[in-house]
């Protein structure tokens, strides 16, 4: 990198030992090595970023060339891929539109129910709630703890003895 040979490194080490002394030389070497590592990592990052920018620029140029050719002279595989992507995008757009329509229908149904509740008489609301409760009890049977048994266990034991 700097084209420094072994003899030049030893000369720098001896000068550093004379100038800094044996106590401060290791600290100075660690500090300099930290700087060297930082500079190397920065240089590596710059190289990677430049390489990415060059790749991106080449990709943009190839896209511009493809657009200039009007996609007519592309290979059949690329044409098929473009068509597949267009179909996928259209399908996603249709699914999104369907989801929006379902959301609108649900909002309309909620508004209708709220309007019916607002327009209903109190007796109709009570009657509707009672019907809902009867549907719930028909669908969900009551818990065993809440239902009193017809005969207790003691009575069953007495009947079994007789």
UniProtKB/Swiss-Prot annotation:
Disordered as annotated region, ranges: 136-162
GO terms for cellular component: TAT protein transport complex
Transmembrane segments: 1-21
Principal localisation: membrane
Subcellular location as annotated: Cell inner membrane
Molecular function per GO: protein transmembrane transporter activity
Family designation: Belongs to the TatB family.
Function description: Part of the twin-arginine translocation (Tat) system that transports large folded proteins containing a characteristic twin-arginine motif in their signal peptide across membranes. Together with TatC, TatB is part of a receptor directly interacting with Tat signal peptides. TatB may form an oligomeric binding site that transiently accommodates folded Tat precursor proteins before their translocation.
UniProt protein name: Sec-independent protein translocase protein TatB
């Amino acid at each position: 990198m700097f084209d420094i040979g072994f003899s030049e490194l030893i000369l720098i080490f001896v000068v550093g030992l004379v100038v800094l002394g044996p106590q401060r030389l290791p600290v100075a070497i660690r500090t300099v090595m930290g700087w060297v590592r930082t500079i190397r990592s920065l240089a590596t990052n710059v190289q990677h970023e430049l390489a990415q920018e060059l790749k991106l620029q080449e990709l943009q140029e190839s896209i511009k060339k493809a657009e200039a050719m009007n996609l007519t002279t592309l290979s059949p595989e690329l044409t098929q891929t473009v068509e597949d992507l267009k179909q996928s995008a259209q399908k996603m757009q249709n699914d999104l539109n369907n989801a929006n329509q379902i959301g609108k229908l649900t909002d309309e149904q909620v508004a209708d129910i709220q309007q019916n509740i607002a327009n209903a008489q109190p007796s109709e609301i009570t009657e509707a709630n009672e019907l809902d409760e009867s549907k719930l009890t028909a669908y969900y049977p009551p818990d065993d703890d809440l239902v009193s048994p017809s005969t207790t266990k003691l009575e069953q034991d007495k009947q079994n003895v007789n």
